[in-house]
Design a protein with these regions (language model features):
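Terminal hydrophobic membrane-targeting helix
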Residues: 38-157
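Short beta-strand segments that buttress and anchor functional surface loops
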Residues: 92-96, 228-235, 334-339, 481-487
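N-terminal type II signal-anchor transmembrane helix
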Residues: 2-65
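Intrinsic-disorder/low-complexity linker and hinge segments
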Residues: 167-179
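Extended serine/threonine-enriched, polar tracts that run as long, contiguous segments within proteins
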Residues: 471-479, 484-493, 501
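Generic long, charged, amphipathic alpha-helical segments
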Residues: 464-467
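Membrane-proximal interfacial segments on either side of biological membranes
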Residues: 22, 59, 76-84, 136, ...
Length: 592
């Protein structure tokens, strides 16, 4: 090669190889060693699979005192999450049956060949974890994270654990023995697509099934509680419940008695899943208890709650204490403190899962049966009427005191058609929103007091009234069997119905005025009616006439039932009052 001529890359590599042949030899040896180590590692891992498979089954059987099956288990060499070389382990088809006896023996009797099949306590579609190659003999092997997928936990009813036959005694491992040659320390468990099924022995009930989209366990140690975070899928209303807390320790003798405590958050749940109501619900709270029995304290907020048939939105907030029966999902509420608009409502009762069979099918859920006792003290009647009215303006305003039963059975009809109530109420300081109706009430009051001229005055004071009655609500109709409507100068006893849809009125009754008929009319016409006063006096009233109210609350029709008037007779001066005043059916909490 001539002086000054440069070598190409290929020539430089050949020259370097001729000058340093030992480097190529060393690299070749390392490559061969790496291949040999990898092959040896793979062979060792494959040979260790049956041993580790058996040890895992034995360790789980010892911990759960139960029969354990594992379909497949494989190990391989590879990098971990932090780049550490180690062993990847994967398993499929893990099943753990309920414990054979309450305590003592970890290997149970085989499942009976006769009778119904026994569901596994735990079924797992797949799991995987990574174990680093670094290991110190005096320290446990640390597994940073275990991945689970397709976990099903099926807890039998409590009665199952009270009648379990003892397993045969023999050469079995002691409880608490892991069955593994070395100790293992776990970091976290991350699981996707889990289902918790809580069995029940109650007739006519189905197990409660809880879908868990994801959960994570941390702080795992034998016979101790662990921390968890979870996302639960709520079926109705559809939404995700975020929860975190402490679970455990796991009760081997009866897993359903394993303690649990935590907080939850449920956001933006669409109440439109339920036929007849609408709104976006959010809820937060905390719970404590066991998997079978939980005490829950929480609050809900639905700023746009409405009955879809009517469409008027109301702000609805609640605070509640609930006792949840985990075996069937039934919930006892004691109490619920709700605020609808400006009205405070106290409720106690239960929400029960309802089941039915249709056309010979198996038992299936048809919704919930809500059965409550409610009480209202110094609430506002317009809050209730606004919710159950097509118009933004309610029928009337005033203070309400109420005691009633409240029930919504399961069904496909809208809520306002399924809802039923039965109780008693007292309304005070009541005014009708319709000017036409309120004017008629005020005219009735002034004439009943014998002040007909004041009734015509545009500057007269507003007249408030009171109402009280027993009542029933069914299929969207309010039935009032003994409505007592009182204003100054008049007392009206009515019975009839009011239809929520359309506001149809249908009432009949008797109006009793303090003034005589002549004083009610006044003027020269009153003088002409003076001889007729004695025909309208009855039971201490200056005037008593049968009346009816029809039409709608917007356009009511008031009338006198003339057919009932001939039955009246002149009241003699010595005639005593024969009818006693109606007893109050719902005295107000406070008088004004």
């Amino acid at each position: 090669m001539e002086a000054g001529q440069k070598m190409g890359p290929a020539q430089e590599q050949r020259s370097f190889a001729r000058r340093h042949p030992w480097l190529l030899g060393t690299a070749g040896v390392f490559f061969v060693l790496l291949v040999a180590i990898t092959v040896a590692g793979i062979m060792t891992a494959r040979r260790a699979e049956p041993y580790l498979h058996a040890r895992i089954v034995q360790g789980l059987a010892s911990h759960f005192h139960a029969r354990v099956e594992l379909d497949t288990f494989h190990v391989s060499l590879g990098n971990g999450l932090r780049g550490e070389w180690g062993v990847w382990a994967q398993g499929h088809g893990l099943r753990i049956w309920p414990p054979a006896e309450v305590a003592g023996v970890e290997v149970p009797n085989p499942p009976p060949t006769n009778g119904p099949p026994v569901e596994p306590l735990i079924s797992l579609a797949s799991f995987g974890f990574h174990v680093p190659l670094r290991y110190k003999p005096d320290q446990p092997i640390y597994i940073g994270q275990i991945h689970l997928e397709g976990l099903h936990i099926h807890l039998p009813p409590k009665s199952h654990f009270l009648h379990i036959a003892p397993a045969p005694t023999g050469n079995v491992a002691q409880p608490g023995s892991s069955g593994l040659p070395v100790s293992v320390q776990l970091g976290n468990v991350d699981c996707k697509d889990a289902v918790l099924i809580l069995g029940t022995s109650k007739p006519g009930k189905l197990p409660l099934e809880i879908d868990i989209a994801r959960f994570k366990l941390s702080g795992i140690s034998p016979n101790n509680a662990m921390h968890f975070e979870a996302e639960l899928t709520n079926p109705r209303p559809v939404g995700t419940i975020h929860t975190k807390g402490i679970f455990g320790p796991w009760q081997v003798s009866d897993p359903g008695e394993s303690p649990i405590a935590g907080d939850y958050r449920f956001d933006d749940a669409d109440l439109g899943d339920f036929n007849g109501i609408a709104g976006t619900l959010s809820s937060t709270g905390n719970y404590v208890g066991t998997l079978r029995d939980l005490n829950v304290d929480g609050q809900t907020d639905t700023p746009d709650f409405s009955l879809t048939h009517f469409g008027n939105q109301m702000d609805l907030k609640t605070q509640f204490h609930a006792i949840v029966d985990g075996t069937n999902g039934d919930t006892r509420l004691d109490p619920v403190n709700a605020v609808l608009g400006h009205t405070h409502i106290t409720a106690r009762g239960q929400v029960v899962r309802a089941f039915a069979k249709e056309d010979g099918d198996s038992l299936h859920s048809v919704g919930h049966d809500i059965d409550l006792k409610i009480e209202v003290n110094q609430g506002r009647i317009e809050d209730f009427l606004h919710l159950a009215s097509h118009d933004a303006t309610p029928l009337l305003t005033g203070d309400i005191n109420l005691k009633s039963s409240f029930r919504i059975p399961p069904g496909k009809e809208p809520v306002h058609e399924r809802m039923s109530m039965k109780g008693l109420f007292f309304l005070d300081h009541t005014e009708f929103s319709s000017t036409k109706v309120q004017d008629r009430i005020e005219e009735l009051s002034f004439r009943g007091q014998g002040k007909p001229h004041d009734a015509k005055s545009p500057d007269h004071e507003s007249i408030e009234s009171t109402m009280q009655s027993d009542f029933e609500v069914a299929q969207g109709v309010i039935n009032l069997p003994n409505l007592d409507f009182t204003v100054r100068g008049a007392d009206i006893a009515l019975k009839g119905t009011y239809k929520l849809d359309g506001g149809l009125l249908g009432f009949t009754g008797v109006a009793k005025m303090q003034a005589t008929i002549s004083k009610m009319v006044g003027g020269w016409k009153g003088l002409l009616l003076k001889p007729a006063d004695r025909f309208f006096k009855k039971d201490g009233a200056g005037t008593e006439v049968p009346i009816h109210i029809a039409g709608t609350y917007k356009n009511p029709e008031f009338g006198v039932d003339v057919k009932g008037m001939p039955h009246s007779h002149p009241q003699r001066p010595d005639e005593k009052q024969s009818a006693e005043p109606q007893a109050q059916v719902a005295a107000p909490a406070t008088q004004h």
